[in-house]
């Protein structure tokens, strides 16, 4: 075991537990638990969004993909960044103005039917759980590699910590864990990027020229098609990334942590700059790993290339820099899973328990109790499923999370705000069509079926797309449209839609429910 890494891991755990202790003292109401009382500034929330969004897949996965596949690895990261243009121009302001705690609140501002809120809440729980299991499986494998801990023990450590942060600290603790993670990640990535760039004499021309001979791909390293050989697959994947982000519940609830829509927009702009700079720096990480660690050493440590960044740190700065990068990866995992637990728990406690079961009549104390127990339940379920999934290829869960978010959530968000004729039937059918089509298509994809036995089942996939976004997203919108136009309810509530338009874009009356 690398003792330096172990001590840095302990330091991060200690720091985050101290944050949780002070956050717990401030978390007395449901507003503070769900949204930190709306007290974050735009820059703070931007850092938290970046901390929530830049997962271990972003830090370790993309650096590894660039190191192994060059251009295709960087192109994969573009989808994550461009997604925030959709969030900025379509989602952030209406969501903040119409909702209160969850995504379902926004839909319920127009449609009062309990079944609509229930379906939206179940989508949130499903997306968060899929994503969380994938993160926990990755966490277990990563910590096992870095510290030599048993996989189950590693998952339990992360699981227990995320439960403590959410149950006791709520959104306040979650936000500050994410902010600290974002600062550490940016600092660590910047240091390594500068060192790598110095090795190339601070010359981009030199760097690109050397990369043509640094890998087995030769000059093709800088060209597309090394990993994604089917253009349709690339298009489908990036479509799901770009549109799926606008429907990810753990990202959406962050817009409730600020006081108004203007600050929500500032949050998105801040997050976009942070995320954009980060992904530019992953090029230096990937190129550096390819040049100074080498293809064989990277794949020997991890076939997918996830150890590229830590190995680069070790090559450049010895055990200390390796330990620092490993600790950042640990903080990255903690920040993301904490946000996922909170989004799933909020959907159950606020939408299902408080609004549907108790019909909005639950007391503040009852809501807080439900939220905390929901956090425990979500955490325990995810931990158990992650332990069970140790030997499985869980890449399909990430594809599924983004596909469901884009196919089931985004049609509801867009049509609720922008389509006058949209009705409850359309909302229900759009959500269900998107959810079911994403589930079915992913279950038939190469992420689940592989003739060589590299996926869950051995056999030929029924569809060639690992991420079915290019099919399931249009189906979600089509289901919402057909559900509306074929509905027996042909009435258009002009007054309600007019009020939604005013509230969505100005925030007028947004606190009056």
Swiss-Prot record:
GO BP: any one term: sodium ion transport
One Pfam entry name: SSF
Annotated compartments: Cell membrane
TM region(s), chain numbering: 3-23, 47-67, 71-91, 129-149, 153-173, 177-197, 233-253, 273-293, 320-340, 374-394, 395-415, 424-444, 462-482
Intrachain disulfide bonds: none
Gene name tied to this protein: ywcA
Coiled coil: none
Protein keywords: Cell membrane, Ion transport, Membrane, Sodium, Sodium transport, Symport, Transmembrane, Transmembrane helix, Transport
The organism of origin for this protein: Bacillus subtilis (strain 168)
Bilayer disposition of the protein: Multi-pass membrane protein
Similarity section: Belongs to the sodium:solute symporter (SSF) (TC 2.A.21) family.
One cellular component (GO) term of this entry: plasma membrane
GO molecular function: acetate transmembrane transporter activity; symporter activity
Presence of keyword Kinase: no
Database matches in InterPro entries: Na/Glc_symporter_sf, Na/solute_symporter, Na/solute_symporter_CS, Sodium:Solute_Symporter
Name this protein carries in UniProt: Uncharacterized symporter YwcA
């Amino acid at each position: 075991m690398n003792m330096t890494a172990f001590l840095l891991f302990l330091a991060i755990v200690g720091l985050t537990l101290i944050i949780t202790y002070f956050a717990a003292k401030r978390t007395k109401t449901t507003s503070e638990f769900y949204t930190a009382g709306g007290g974050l500034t735009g820059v703070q929330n931007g850092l938290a969004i970046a901390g929530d969004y830049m997962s271990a897949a972003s830090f370790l996965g993309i650096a590894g993909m660039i190191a192994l596949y060059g251009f295709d690895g960087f192109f994969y990261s573009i989808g994550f960044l461009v997604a925030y243009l959709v969030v900025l121009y379509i989602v952030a302001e209406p969501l903040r103005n119409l909702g209160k705690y969850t995504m379902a609140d926004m839909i319920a501002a127009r449609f009062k039917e309990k079944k609509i809120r229930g379906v939206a809440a179940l989508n949130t729980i499903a997306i968060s759980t899929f994503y969380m299991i994938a993160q926990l499986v990755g966490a277990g494998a990563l910590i096992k590699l870095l510290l030599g801990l048993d996989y189950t023990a590693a998952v339990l450590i992360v699981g227990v910590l995320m439960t403590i942060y959410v149950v006791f600290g709520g959104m306040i603790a979650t936000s500050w864990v994410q902010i600290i993670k974002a600062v550490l990640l940016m600092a660590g990535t910047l240091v390594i990027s500068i060192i790598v760039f110095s090795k190339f004499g601070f010359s981009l021309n030199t760097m690109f020229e050397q990369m043509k001979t640094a890998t087995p791909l030769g000059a093709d390293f800088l060209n597309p098609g090394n990993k994604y050989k089917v253009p349709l697959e690339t298009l489908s994947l990036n479509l799901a990334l770009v549109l799926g982000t606008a429907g990810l519940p753990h990202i959406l609830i962050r817009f409730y942590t600020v006081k108004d829509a203007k600050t929500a927009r500032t949050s998105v702009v801040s997050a976009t700059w942070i995320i954009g700079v980060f992904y530019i720096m992953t090029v230096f990480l990937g190129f550096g790993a390819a040049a100074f660690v080498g293809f064989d050493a990277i794949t020997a440590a991890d076939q997918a290339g996830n150890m590229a960044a830590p190995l680069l740190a070790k090559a450049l700065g010895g055990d200390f820099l390796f330990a620092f990068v490993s600790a950042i990866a640990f903080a990255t995992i903690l920040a993301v899973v904490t946000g996922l637990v909170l989004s799933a728990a909020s959907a159950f406690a606020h939408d299902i328990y408080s609004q549907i079961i108790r019909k909005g009549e639950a007391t503040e104390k009852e809501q807080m109790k439900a939220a905390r127990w929901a956090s425990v339940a979500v955490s325990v379920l995810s931990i158990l499923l992650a332990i069970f999934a140790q030997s499985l290829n869980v890449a399909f869960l990430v594809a599924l999370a983004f596909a469901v978010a884009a196919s089931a959530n985004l049609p509801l968000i867009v049509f609720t705000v922008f389509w006058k004729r949209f009705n409850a039937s359309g909302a229900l059918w759009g959500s269900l069509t998107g959810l079911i089509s994403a589930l079915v298509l992913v279950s038939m994809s190469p992420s689940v079926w592989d003739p060589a036995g590299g996926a869950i089942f051995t056999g030929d996939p029924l569809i060639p797309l690992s991420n079915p976004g290019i099919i399931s997203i249009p189906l979600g919108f089509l289901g919402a449209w057909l559900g509306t136009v074929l509905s027996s309810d042909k009435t258009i509530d002009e007054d309600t839609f007019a009020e939604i338009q005013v509230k969505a874009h100005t925030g007028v009356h947004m606190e009056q429910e």
